């Protein structure tokens, strides 16, 4: 999982990337290609 300051560019890396908010943190999840997972902050 990548940890980045901004997830805007990471959301565009794959067409199945979804932005989700869990427990005050922002995540990118991708069910078809899990290597694109990321967390902000």
UniProtKB/Swiss-Prot annotation:
Record carries keyword Transmembrane: no
UniProt-recorded name of the protein: Large ribosomal subunit protein bL36
Keywords: Ribonucleoprotein, Ribosomal protein
Family from the record: Belongs to the bacterial ribosomal protein bL36 family.
GO biological process terms on file: translation
Molecular function terms from GO: structural constituent of ribosome
Alphabetized Pfam families for the sequence: Ribosomal_L36 (PF00444)
Superkingdom field: Bacteria
Gene Ontology CC, one term: ribonucleoprotein complex
Keyword Ribosomal protein attributed: yes
């Amino acid at each position: 999982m990548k940890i980045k300051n901004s997830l805007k560019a990471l959301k565009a890396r794959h067409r199945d990337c979804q932005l989700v908010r869990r427990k005050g943190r922002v995540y990118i999840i991708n069910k078809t290609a899990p290597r694109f997972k990321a967390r902000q902050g």
